[in-house]
Amino acid sequence: MGDEDWEAEILKPHVSSYVPVFEKDKYSSGANGDTFNRTSASSDIGESSKKENTSTTGGFGRGKGFGNRGFLNNKFEEGDSSGFWKESNNDCEDNQTRSRGFSKRGGCQDGNDSEASGPFRRGGRGSFRGCRGGFGLGRPNSESDQDQGTQRGGGLFGSRKPAASDSGNGDTYQSRSGSGRGGYKGLNEEVVTGSGKNSWKSETEGGESSDSQGPKVTYIPPPPPEDEDSIFAHYQTGINFDKYDTILVEVSGHDAPPAILTFEEANLCQTLNNNIAKAGYTKLTPVQKYSIPIVLAGRDLMACAQTGSGKTAAFLLPILAHMMRDGITASRFKELQEPECIIVAPTRELINQIYLEARKFSFGTCVRAVVIYGGTQFGHSVRQIVQGCNILCATPGRLMDIIGKEKIGLKQVKYLVLDEADRMLDMGFGPEMKKLISCPGMPSKEQRQTLLFSATFPEEIQRLAGDFLKSSYLFVAVGQVGGACRDVQQTILQVGQYSKREKLVEILRNIGDERTMVFVETKKKADFIATFLCQEKISTTSIHGDREQREREQALGDFRCGKCPVLVATSVAARGLDIENVQHVINFDLPSTIDEYVHRIGRTGRCGNTGRAISFFDTDSDNHLAQPLVKVLSDAQQDVPAWLEEIAFSTYVPPSFSSSTRGGAVFASVDTRKNYQGKHTLNTAGISSSQAPNPVDDESWD
């Protein structure tokens, strides 16, 4: 029909919309232009348009693509970048609903032409859902739809109002149709009119897919090994493990139970004792000596202990002992699973690590641990839970999704554990944690036992913890280690921003193949530095929050096995990760807080092993860390560079900057409750007492 009269199409809604004719079963072709051009002859499109179309990614001129929603009855499953849905069933029938439009909001207009106006300002968007503006054709699903006389999605080309509406001001065609979505409604889609936006809903599994959530996650992590040797593979303790006995421990609160010296004193069941022995645990660490009897006594606990000191076992063992003694309620034969224990951690890698520890200690018992986290298929998480769940290990986002979709009940929760609790209660996850304890069915803090563990507990975090803990909770502070582990040799180098890469390569070449973690501040920089090191012939991988879960797990696997001895990471890997034989940590970028510095360098020097941490200090951006760094180095009996001391004494730090830089403080984190009774300070062997620290001010590191 030659050049189409676009004005007539716009201003005369009774004229039927032009719909290009497609050959059946050929929507899966690669480029939009190719598919369209095969039918352009029958559609009276000129040869010149055809040539122009083939030179771009879309149809009808440069910068635009012809899109196709395809068959919305699960006939098309995968989309490509061109806007077509790849066909998974060759038996698609013509009477299925189809909806097509011109993409890139272009219509016949160049999508990049900012001078366009009037009806050509916006056309349709032809990718999935018919999208905004443009020509769309909705074929009814049944004859009754035609008889009802109502159009199901939109009406005029470019009209924001429903087709059944007669109101308008003459230039409604410049807006969008169907409440902001062009064309007509397609199959399995709800269009809600009356507002400027369209509420679109698709019949997808679990309701995960939405406009804002992006593509549906299909990744299912491989199951962990089931053989006993793999389950009980353990971390070898280092030469300094016995030095833990010299660390001071402060327990504050009323009527704290006495510490234990051996696992036998805990009176655990024989199965647990056997699993402890298989895991290679022969001696209690300081946090375990005090935390295990406190949890066994049913008391709420806030425990602060150095990185790599066995905090996970300190809460898992007594919880499992309670479950073995009191019995469990969850069963795979129950329709709704109601876990007795919920453990929450801030990162996927850490919560998976906790799950593996829970599976290890519960081996051969009736207790079943389950782990769920984001980046994996939602249905997979549900399937794991319905098989039986006594201990639920979860990241905050996936946990709230599971609760919101009523896949678990909370009435039986007896134990709530927040690992890396300072991170869980800050502005990052604090609101979600408050939602958790406010969920219907969740027992109040007086009816459950709440345990908080971390290597650092700033004062403001302790105040927030009051919403989670009973007022009679006990506080355990393990020694002077909230600053840094003494088994880590710390080195601070003064390196400018533009000299860091050269210095990093120099250090890594001297290190050789020893396992090294390099921390940077941003996700983009993590990939950039990893690529740069690979170009320098240094095998490197990276991990950060923007990588898919499959890629994150692959990166960790390559790092653990030594395939890539260098791992460039953001703070997603700074907390809790227990990777054997990490000899070096390099802070390419120093973090914004000293607490994060402590967690980062804690990836090495674990369980009595020695390690080395090197940090690049940029005087243009890191001066705020000078004073707390001097304090951390001094407390860990490390050499403090003279230039760093000079910067520290010349830099003003607000009084509220740090709770751990208290003058003369013995403990890096102390109980902030005022006028409490029963505070006592002991060495970890429990033989003698030492004088409690002097009162300190209210400075804060955070």
From Swiss-Prot:
UniProt feature, compositional bias: Polar residues: 29-46, 141-150, 195-215, 681-693
Superkingdom classification of source: Eukaryota
Principal location class: cytoplasm
Thylakoid among keywords: no
GO cellular component: chromatoid body; cytoplasm; cytosol; nucleus; perinuclear region of cytoplasm; pi-body; piP-body; ribonucleoprotein complex
Reaction catalysed by this enzyme: ATP + H2O = ADP + phosphate + H(+)
Start-end of Gly residues biased regions: 58-68, 125-137
Phosphoserine modification, residue list: 195, 199, 700
EC number: 3.6.4.13
Motif (Q motif): 261-289
Residue stretches making up the Helicase ATP-binding domain: 292-475
Keywords of the record: ATP-binding, Cytoplasm, Developmental protein, Differentiation, Helicase, Hydrolase, Meiosis, Nucleotide-binding, Phosphoprotein, Repeat, RNA-mediated gene silencing, Spermatogenesis
Region entry Interaction with RANBP9, spans: 201-220
Disordered as annotated region, ranges: 22-228, 681-702
Similarity comment: Belongs to the DEAD box helicase family. DDX4/VASA subfamily.
Subunit structure: Found in a mRNP complex, at least composed of TDRD1, TDRD6, TDRD7 and DDX4. Interacts with RANBP9. Interacts with RANBP10. Interacts with PIWIL2 and MAEL. Interacts with BMAL1 and CLOCK. Interacts with Tex19.1 and, probably, Tex19.2. Interacts with RBM46.
Protein name in the entry: ATP-dependent RNA helicase DDX4
Organism: Mus musculus (Mouse)
Origin organism lineage: Eukaryota, Metazoa, Chordata, Craniata, Vertebrata
Gene: Ddx4
